[in-house]
Curated annotation (Swiss-Prot):
This is Holliday junction branch migration complex subunit RuvA. Residues 65-143 are annotated as: Domain II. GO terms for molecular function: ATP binding; four-way junction DNA binding; four-way junction helicase activity. Residues 144-164 are annotated as: Flexible linker. It comes from Roseobacter denitrificans (strain ATCC 33942 / OCh 114). Keywords: Cytoplasm, DNA damage, DNA recombination, DNA repair, DNA-binding. Homotetramer. Forms an RuvA(8)-RuvB(12)-Holliday junction (HJ) complex. HJ DNA is sandwiched between 2 RuvA tetramers; dsDNA enters through RuvA and exits via RuvB. An RuvB hexamer assembles on each DNA strand where it exits the tetramer. Each RuvB hexamer is contacted by two RuvA subunits (via domain III) on 2 adjacent RuvB subunits; this complex drives branch migration. In the full resolvosome a probable DNA-RuvA(4)-RuvB(12)-RuvC(2) complex forms which resolves the HJ.
Amino acid sequence: MIGKITGRLEYRASDHVLIDVRGVGYLVFCSERTLAALPGVGEVVALYTDLLVREDVMQLFGFTTLTEKEWHRLLTSVQGVGAKASLAILGTLGADGVSRAIALGDWNAVKAAKGVGPKIAQRVVLDLKDKAPSVMGMSDTQATVAAQSSDAVIETRAAPSPVVQNPSAQAEALSALSNLGYAPGDAAAAVAQAAGELPDAETPDLIRAALKRLAPKG
């Protein structure tokens, strides 16, 4: 299975791009948010990928971060949510926004995605609420282009390419609260609330804000 692809961006459409890898063109479907973050045509691009194989179709989906890829995998595991709906949700909310919406049980935020109705949105939140803490705790590793190789397809079993580790303040705050003994679901909801109100907060500020929300009322 192809886990990451690096090559030159040949063209972009409304829902996909064509990436040339040593003369072979790979059609990669992406969310609107991911498409907007990609470089211009002719430049080198790197994406984490997920391959969908069915009897009648084989499609490759691309993501700029492992967190986005993991949410796509989880979203498409929900009954009634296909790849198109998953990309719509990720395009509307982004990976962090999906984490916050699901941790807080905010199905209205999920419903804002094109083609996602209230029943599906509620099912997404209900089915994935317990998954949010583990995804929020992931290091948000971003797909990067290795300077020595602009044309390579990297399989998941191959040696890993250089990556930039950038643990988010959200992940660090969640880890700290878990170490303090808070339940994963409670910690995730508190961090999600704090991150929504303080999007640029550093880890210590995010922890303090989350602790205020976890403090007993009264």
